[in-house]
Amino acid sequence: MKKILSLLCMVAASFAEGQSLAAPASARLSPAEQNIASKSLTNTPQQYQEFNALAAALVRRALETSDASYYAQAETALKRSLQLVPDNFEAEKIRVSILLGEHDFPAALDAAQTLNRRVPDDVMVYGLLTDANMELGNYKDAETAAQWMLNLRPGNLPALTRAAKLRELFGDAEGAYELMELALQSTSPADAEERASLLTQMGHLRLASGSADAAEKLLQQATSLIPNYPAALGDLAKIRIAGKQFADAVALLEQRYQAVPRAENLYDLAEALQLAGRHDEAKRAFADFGRRSLAESNAKDNSNRKLVFYYADKVQMPVKALDLAKQEFQWRHDVFTLDAYAWALHENGQEAEARKQIETALAVGIRDASLLRHAGEIAAKIGDTFAAESYLKQSVDLNAMDSERARITLAGLPQAAKQ
């Protein structure tokens, strides 16, 4: 497979401003993107559609690799497209995808709404609306947009995957799995990247439901298609941790971190090192995470939710945890931000508000072992042992990574609550 650099150099000369689309020398387009880009760039590179195709390929590659540098390259390609044909609709859609990838969700939502008013029956604009609303916690609006996708083009693949993500958030893991399975059946056997992504999401759903064996099979299928597929490695590590195979979990998370050296991945590796008894290495990894995460904390694309838990649980800085959680809460209200905010409130002794926020998150319907454990510990702190028992039992029943701590907390509840 040709390196992306060799493809991009073909268009560099056509940039009026002399801008370059150079990528890391080791970067590669997946086969589908290589086909699009090479076909386009060997025809007439002056045509705006070809720069759109290149930008779309780069966005997809950014999603596959979690390498944000591809978004800047995609933006450069879009600028050329828009110079050739100002305000062309496809370029504007791709620009929203870039905003989503850069985690500027409010700007993405605003831009997608503008495009929706311009062309009210474009399926993928509804997909962009779904994505932005999900990330911001506007779940009703996300559901409405996903339904429009299905109404306009029944059974289309992007709609199925988005509907599946919503079903999971609403607590219907089985329904989510069925939709992902339909999406997999609709995906070409030649599209290894898309199939690996879908298999990983299906494995995640089985793991979230406590079916570790089924999850393992699906995740292994994903890595057979794309060796060392980062998302699959992360979920395989969760299975190893749940099975107390901590050394194996460390090895998997080291592979993932080498492939995608992002701060949030370092945090997961540090936790696994701690569980494996490699305390000095864990301490260094946590400290490195803290420095890196703090440095990016004011950017939209950050690891602030992990940093909240680092401050709250690892270095006992509850005030910093709460300040950071409030910063995130100001602009997004998805269930995971609410969870981090609730936990920071709990660590600062603000139990009533903590309970309000965690119950707001759970009211969406999500069944997540960590959120349920947090809800249980908050309820226990307030003295509502019956609610605490209910939440903790649900966390334990999911048999996930956080279930062991829930089991320990449950065992420590007053006996009257368990009768």
Q: Where in the sequence are the language-model features?
A:
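Short coil turns that delineate tetratricopeptide repeat
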Residues: 45, 86, 120, 154, ...
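Start-of-helix register in tetratricopeptide repeats
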Residues: 49, 56, 90, 124, ...
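N-terminal leader/linker segments that initiate helical-solenoid repeat arrays
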Residues: 16-90, 101, 106, 110, ...
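Canonical tetratricopeptide repeat
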Residues: 53, 94, 128, 162, ...
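Residue-level recognition of tetratricopeptide repeat
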Residues: 56, 63, 97, 131, ...
